[in-house]
Each structure stands twice: as structure tokens, then as C-alpha cells.
A protein has these predicted regions:
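Beta-strand-turn-beta hairpins that frame and shape the catalytic cleft
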Residues: 1-11, 79-89, 121, 170-177, ...
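Conserved catalytic scaffold of divalent metal-dependent phosphoesterases
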Residues: 15-20, 55-145
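Short, well-ordered alpha-helix to beta-strand connector turns
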Residues: 29-30, 51-53, 71-72, 119, ...
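Conserved beta-sheet core of the metallophosphoesterase superfamily
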Residues: 46-48, 53-60, 68, 133-196
Length: 198
């Protein structure tokens, strides 16, 4: 993974097949791949041979087996240290259909997220309530639990997909917010030790 004091560059994928083939995207200089859900196995299979760390969360349209055999580590409600950063995640979205595996009531999402401690980089399929969501579209309302998590834990970066914000919020308080649809290259924050002056 290179120098632990330098920022990592991530290829982040969410919601739809990138318009550039994954094999070509992986030729770019990246340190890891982050998946934010609603991507089919067919969309992800090119990652199987990539010798990079791969972390992800599932989206509201996923079945929960899309990462199998591809080497993507599911970080839903988990914390994982990588390259000097702590990553965590939350799968799914606001419950708008009862038959979806990765949908939550606002109350259930809040309860689950209270168990997740501080992370530097938070991966989520859904945005937080009131940030890059759509209050007029029941399927694209953000999760109150994610908003509470941002207020409580203040991660350095929050990455999400799921919605279609016309002008995405890029910062909320101390947290950099990145909306992803298709693919996006993101420079992650420097590890905490290298963010403090010597």
C-alpha cells in the first residue's frame, strides 16, 4: 500500500456500471477500490483479479452475494484498518419496500449505527438525512442514523451513492462528503498521525 503517511487514492464505484471499462480504470494509479452498492456481479467481476484492497457496502437493490468470489470485504457495521485509516460502513437505504434485504426503518438504522465507533472514512449506500438526499422522493430520503453518526463521530470523509443531487454537498462540518454515481477517483484524507503538525 505505499507510504503510510501519504494519502491513498481510491477508485469508488456506486449504482451503475462505469462508462469506462473497469479494467481500464484499474490501470490508473489507485491504492484501493471502494464499492457503495447497487452494482451487479457482472459489473464487479473485473475486480476479481485486481491485487488491491477492496472494501464495500451493499445497496438497497443488492441481494448480498455480489461480493462473493471477487475479494470485496463487506464493511457493513464493521471497522477495518487499512493504510493508516479506519474504514467503516453501512449498507442499504431508507425502507420504502418491505421486500428489500438492505432497507431500514429510520429507527432501526439509528439503533444499528449507535454500535459503530469512530472511523476516518465512512462508506454508505445512502446519504445522511438532509445531505444530498431528496425529501420529496420516498426512495431517496437519507437516513437519520447516518446524520446522527456524522454529528457524533465526525469522520474525515463520508462516501455515498443512491441519490441524484443536482449540486452535491461536498462538506458538512468537519467531514468531506463525496457523492458517487458510476465511478469517481477520490483522494482519501491523510492518516491522522500525518495530519497533525510535528
Amino acid at each position: 500500500m505505499g507510504d503510510p503517511h501519504l494519502s491513498l487514492r481510491a477508485l469508488v464505484l456506486a449504482d451503475e456500471r462505469p462508462y469506462v471499462p473497469l479494467a481500464r480504470l484499474l490501470e490508473r494509479e489507485v491504492d484501493l477500490v471502494l464499492c457503495l452498492g447497487d452494482l451487479s456481479r457482472a459489473d464487479l467481476v473485473a475486480l476479481a483479479d485486481a491485487r488491491l484492497p477492496k472494501l464495500g457496502v451493499y445497496g438497497n437493490h443488492d441481494e448480498g452475494d455480489e461480493f462473493d468470489g471477487i475479494g470485496i470485504e463487506d464493511v457493513h457495521l464493521r471497522r477495518i484498518e487499512l493504510g493508516g485509516l479506519c474504514f467503516g460502513g453501512f449498507s442499504g437505504s431508507h425502507e420504502y419496500h418491505e421486500d428489500r434485504r438492505f432497507t431500514w426503518t429510520q429507527k432501526k438504522a439509528s439503533k444499528l449505527l449507535r454500535k459503530l465507533g469512530h472511523v476516518d472514512v465512512m462508506l454508505a449506500h445512502s446519504p445522511p438525512l438532509g445531505i444530498n438526499d431528496d425529501a420529496d422522493d420516498r426512495a431517496h430520503i437519507g437516513l437519520a442514523g447516518l446524520r446522527e453518526y456524522l454529528e457524533r463521530e465526525r469522520p474525515a470523509m463520508f462516501l455515498h451513492g443512491h441519490t441524484y443531487p443536482p449540486l452535491p454537498v461536498e462538506r458538512w462540518g468537519d467531514t468531506e462528503v463525496r457523492h458517487v454515481r458510476g465511478h469517481r477517483f477520490v483522494t482519501l484524507p491523510a492518516p491522522v498521525a500525518s495530519r497533525t503538525p510535528a
